[in-house]
């Protein structure tokens, strides 16, 4: 991908450990780089908080990000805090096979970075653009790790709030992973404060259009079922707001597609306009979709090997960082990062010495 004037230059070293090797993707809120972890000698993806339109950087002279839009410094700092919160959320689920792993995060250059595992593959959106549809039976098997990961997310009182084909990675070996936790929130606090509005037409249920909409696991279940609907039919799911007036959601079988009544009914129920009519948790959804969540978990991704479904491709990550008020930062300070650079430099030198002997 072609780099712009604001991207870090190839060869830039971050905290003495990560070397920038190129640009993977750019979005309205940031830049994603291909990087090299010099300590472990492996490729990584590095997300940089860089909200376009309010910041700049002159890479001819420095790597530091500068806020240029008058009056936006406070919003920039809040957005950076949310960005680091995303890393913290991802790190909570680093052992889940269905979630992209966050390996590291830190502040430097007056901005913030998240280091993630580098995945070769395509987004589900890109895959569907090339292949149109996925057979229903194949899809429900592929989704097992992601659904189990979503259940774990909900068990921690969190909801993702942005599940859609462009936030799911499909890997060359057939595995899929959920990414982009920029919109994740603690749903257990919805009674005390409103959740900010985050929506993607077709995948967002009605409660996400409302400032004080009551969101919970049922919100993610709607988005997941809408994503499944898109995968199986090849058609974009209708906007939930339009369905409030005239619910014209076609059943999957109405497209002339072969699908078991069990799968179809579970997806359609999960896409119910009224939250009370949807599944209230992942376990109940899986009970209908698979005929027994616990049984399916035992047969999950650890024992079954999915057939390859895509060719290798580079990752292009979307940034979606909100600027809302958050608690005082608990992330690494500039002094801590500088101290860490010294330790990393020492370890790299020692490793180099061992290699040369």
Could you say what each language-model-derived stretch is?
Residues 21-27, 32:
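Protein kinase glycine-rich loop
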Residues 202-298:
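C-terminal lobe helix-coil module of Hanks-type protein kinase domains
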Residues 142-143:
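Activation segment signature within eukaryotic-like protein kinase domains
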Residues 146-158:
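Protein kinase catalytic-loop region centered on the HRD/HxD motif
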């Amino acid at each position: 991908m072609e780099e712009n004037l604001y991207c870090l230059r190839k060869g830039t070293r971050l905290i003495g450990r990560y070397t920038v090797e190129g640009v993977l993707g750019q979005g309205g809120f940031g830049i994603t780089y291909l990087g090299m972890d010099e300590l472990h000698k492996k490729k990584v993806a590095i997300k940089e908080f860089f909200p376009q339109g309010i910041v700049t950087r002159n890479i001819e002279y420095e790597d530091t990000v500068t806020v240029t839009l008058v009056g936006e410094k406070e919003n920039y700092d809040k957005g950076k805090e949310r960005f680091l919160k995303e890393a913290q959320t991802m790190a909570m689920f680093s052992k889940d096979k269905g979630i992209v792993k966050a390996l590291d995060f830190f502040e430097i250059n007056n901005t913030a970075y998240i280091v993630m595992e580098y995945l070769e593959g395509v987004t589900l959106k890109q895959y569907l653009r090339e292949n149109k549809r996925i057979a229903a039976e194949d899809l429900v098997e592929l989704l097992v790790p992601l659904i189990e990961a979503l259940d774990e997310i909900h068990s921690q009182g969190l909801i993702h709030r942005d599940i859609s084909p462009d936030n799911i990675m499909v890997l060359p070996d057939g595995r899929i992973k959920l990414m982009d936790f920029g919109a994740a929130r603690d749903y257990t606090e919805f009674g005390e404060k409103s959740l900010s509005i985050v929506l993607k037409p077709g995948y967002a249920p009605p409660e996400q259009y409302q400032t004080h909409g009551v969101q919970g696991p049922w919100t993610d279940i709607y988005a997941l079922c809408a994503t499944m609907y898109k995968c199986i039919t090849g058609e974009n799911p209708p906007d939930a707001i339009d369905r409030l007036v005239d619910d014209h959601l076609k059943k999957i079988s109405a497209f002339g597609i072969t699908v078991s009544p069990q799968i179809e009914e579970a997806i359609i129920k999960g896409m119910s306009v009224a939250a009370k009519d949807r599944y209230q948790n992942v376990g109940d959804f899986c009970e209908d979709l698979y005929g027994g969540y616990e049984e399916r978990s035992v047969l999950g991704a650890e024992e079954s090997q999915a057939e390859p479904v895509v060719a290798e491709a580079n990752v292009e990550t979307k940034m979606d960082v909100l600027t809302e008020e958050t608690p005082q930062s608990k992330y690494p300070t500039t002094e801590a990062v500088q101290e860490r650079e010294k330790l990393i430099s020492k370890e790299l030198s020692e490793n180099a010495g061992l290699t040369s002997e």
